[in-house]
Swiss-Prot record:
Pfam families: PBP_GOBP. It comes from Solenopsis invicta (Red imported fire ant). Belongs to the PBP/GOBP family. Keywords: Behavior, Disulfide bond, Pheromone response, Pheromone-binding, Secreted, Signal, Transport. Workers bearing only the B allele invariably have a single queen, whereas colonies with workers bearing the alternate, b allele have multiple queens. The two social forms differ in many key reproductive and life history characteristics. Changing A35E: In strain: O-40 and Pi-21. Changing L68P: In strain: SC-670. This is Pheromone-binding protein Gp-9. The lineage of its organism: Eukaryota, Metazoa, Ecdysozoa, Arthropoda, Hexapoda. The gene is Gp-9.
Length: 153
C-alpha cells in the first residue's frame, strides 16, 4: 500500500511540475519560426508573455498597451508563417486542422468549439497584431478552464 501511495504522489508531483513548466513557457515558443519572428520585431524572449500569464489574463493588467501589441505582432508573424493567417485574415479551416493535429482533439471536442468561438469573437478586428494576441489569449484561457473542469470531473 505504501508503494501505491508513493507512486500516486510521484505521479502528482510530475504532473504539477509539467503544468508549471508549461505555464512558464513563452507563448509561441514551440513554433519553428519563433526566433525569426522575434528578430523581425526586434524583441527578445524576455519581451514575450508566458503561457500562464496569458491563460490567466494577467498579461492585460501587468503590461502596457505597446507590450501587448508587440506580443500580438509576434503571434501574427508565427500564424502567418505557418499559413494560418494572411494579414489580418484567418484561414479558419487550416487553423482548425493544425489545432487538431497539435492537440489531438477529436470531432466534438470542447477545445475545437472553444477555438471556433475565439475565431468568431476576433474575426472582425482590423489590427492584425491585436487580433492575433486576443485569439491566442482566448484559446489559452479556454484551454485552462476546460483543463480545470476536467480535473474536477
Amino acid at each position: 500500500m505504501k508503494t501505491f501511495v508513493l507512486h500516486i504522489f510521484i505521479f502528482a508531483l510530475v504532473a504539477f511540475a509539467s503544468a508549471s513548466r508549461d505555464s512558464a513557457r513563452k507563448i509561441g515558443s514551440q513554433y519553428d519560426n519563433y526566433a525569426t519572428c522575434l528578430a523581425e520585431h526586434s524583441l527578445t524572449e524576455d519581451d514575450i508573455f508566458s503561457i500562464g500569464e496569458v491563460s490567466s489574463g494577467q498579461h492585460k493588467t501587468n503590461h502596457e498597451d505597446t507590450e501587448l501589441h508587440k506580443n500580438g505582432c509576434v503571434m501574427q508573424c508565427l500564424l502567418e508563417k505557418d499559413g494560418l493567417m494572411s494579414g489580418a485574415d484567418y484561414d479558419e479551416e487550416k487553423m482548425r486542422e493544425d489545432y487538431i493535429k497539435e492537440t489531438g482533439a477529436q470531432p466534438g471536442d470542447q477545445r475545437i468549439e472553444a477555438l471556433n468561438a475565439c475565431m468568431q469573437e476576433t474575426k472582425d478586428m482590423e489590427d492584425k497584431c491585436d487580433k492575433s494576441l486576443l485569439l491566442v489569449a482566448c484559446v489559452l484561457a479556454a484551454e485552462a478552464v476546460l483543463a480545470d473542469s476536467n480535473e474536477g470531473a
